[in-house]
Amino acid sequence: MTEHSFKQIDVFSNKGFRGNPVAVFFDADNLSQKEMQQIAKWTNLSETTFVQKPTIDKADYRLRIFTPECELSFAGHPTIGSCFAVVESGYCTPKNCKIIQECLAGLVELTIDGEKDEDTWISFKLPYYKILQTSETAISEVENALGIPLNYSSQVSPPVLIDDGPKWLVIQLPNATDVLNLVPKFQSLSQVCKNNDWIGVTVFGELGKDSFESRSFAPLIHVNEDPACGSGAGAVGVYIGSSQKTPTSLSFTISQGTKLSRQAISKVSVDVSSNKSIAVFVGGQAKTCISGKSFI
């Protein structure tokens, strides 16, 4: 049996118990893939992470990210929460307000802004993204599983499949009320995601000026609705960026978790260059809710 420091971090909130929790286990180099997966299944959170020594010189640490069912190459809220945990614990120190995370998706640069924990925002740049093709049949099946009105698409851009670590089908609805009124059929939605090799569906609609309400559904990995989803927010950034006709920079906030009695907030910045490449940055706050030791 080995002893490991452990923190449970609430992400996309600085109040505690209002965002999305991630379990962070330190000094996990001696844990096997099987052990990490077993622990993630036991914590039963949407993601559990394991901090290891980096294998790339530029990185401050290596992060393994697990859902209860599988390992992910990248995920947003575990990235922000784990960065907060390693800095708060003194595991590593930011250099010029930067931390470099190594994960299966490659190197992820994080920026830390703010002097005090309650004022600190941690943001990451999406390590990569791909806009993929998907079938009209699959989109129709998702719309049916979510109970989306048939005429919604005349008011917004069409759905887009985006791979930014996980694969999200991103759907825009006319407004936040439409998003909150969705009543998903999770079994049907899970089957569509399984058939098409997606992790899930992220839906968003306008809440106000430069703000959106969003919901992310991933029943295939036993996360019917994620209280706050960083990669989902990043996919929304890619979706919005891909619709821009000229080079531009824009930013907006995303509210998430409303239907789960949470109050999660993320900030998204999008830079679209003259060659149509898109840089997306997702930021959030975090707070330690549980700290102690685990015995494995």
UniProtKB/Swiss-Prot annotation:
It is an enzyme of class 5 (isomerase). The active site is at residue 47. Keywords: Isomerase. GO terms for cellular component: cytoplasm; cytosol; nucleus. The keyword Membrane does not apply. One of its GO terms (biological process) is biosynthetic process. Signal peptide: none annotated. SUPFAM superfamilies: Diaminopimelate epimerase-like. It holds the Pfam family PhzC-PhzF. Transmembrane segments: none annotated. Belongs to the PhzF family. This is Antisense-enhancing sequence 1. The gene is aes1.
